Design a protein with these regions (language model features):
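Two-component/phosphorelay signaling modules centered on CheY-like receiver
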Residues: 6, 11, 19-39
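Acidic catalytic/metal-coordinating carboxylates
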Residues: 42-45, 70-76, 188
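Receiver (REC) domain active-site loop signature in two-component systems and cognate sites
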Residues: 66
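Conserved hydrophobic beta-strand signature of PAS-family and PAS-like sensory domains
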Residues: 157, 164-167
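PAS/PAS-like sensory domain cap-loop motif
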Residues: 173-184
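PAS-family sensory/regulatory domains
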Residues: 185-197
Length: 212
């Protein structure tokens, strides 16, 4: 598959590897693709680096067998802080015990050494594509909430479906009508006609909804 370098450049990677040669070579290569690559030489340093930069680190690539703190133990500690950050394990092992432990830690992928760089980049590409979609959805939800706040603070708002069943009312409408949203959502618009709402207000609402 093609690698979206522009997309990868929006993200920051934590790379943990105890082999000096592999760490230097791969980190230099990955720096061409990511916005930033934080590098650590063992699990203890990797954990410290994550704690110091957790607000900007988007995903983790880590070796399994390392001195001081191995990859499994490091990720266990990271998972107590962030249970969603995507993780890829690089390992020379593919035994069932490791896989079971990785599943418990919600590891997205694992890659067997020696690392196939193109395959690794394709894994990264899939992960950041999902992260970016989640970001866009979150951004849309936040913008919608801001829009609702603006609308709610300045206008009386009532929405209906094509059958004139009430689907949404804002706080200002509730204050004026004397109902709460739970009492109104799902009711037919004409429900208001038989309550205490003034007939001229109901008529204006009805006409405006039909015209819009």
């Amino acid at each position: 598959m093609s690698i979206d370098k522009n997309l990868l450049k929006k993200f920051t990677l934590l790379y943990v590897e105890d082999d000096d040669v592999i760490r230097v070579e791969l980190s230099q290569l990955l720096s061409n693709f990511f916005s930033m690559v934080h590098v650590a030489k063992n699990g203890k340093e990797g954990l410290r680096t994550f704690l110091e930069n957790q607000d900007e680190i988007d995903l983790i690539l880590t070796d399994l067998n390392m001195p001081e703190l191995n990859g499994i133990e490091m990720i266990k500690k990271i998972r107590t802080i962030d249970n969603k950050i995507p993780i890829i394990f690089a390992t020379a092992h593919s035994d069932s015990e490791f896989l079971a432990e990785a599943i418990k830690l919600r590891v997205q992928e694992y890659i067997v050494k020696p690392i196939d760089v193109r395959y690794l980049l394709s894994l990264f590409n899939d992960i950041v594509s999902n992260l970016y979609q989640e970001f866009l959805l979150k951004q849309q939800r936040e913008e919608l909430e801001k829009y609702k706040e603006i609308i709610n603070s300045n206008n009386i708002v009532i929405k209906t479906d094509t059958h004139l069943n009430i689907t949404y009312v804002n706080e200002l409408f509730c204050e004026i009508s004397g109902f709460n949203s739970e009492e109104l959502i799902g009711k037919e618009l004409k429900y208001l006609k038989y309550q205490d709402m003034a007939s001229d207000i109901y008529t204006n609402l009805y006409v405006n909804i039909l015209n819009n």
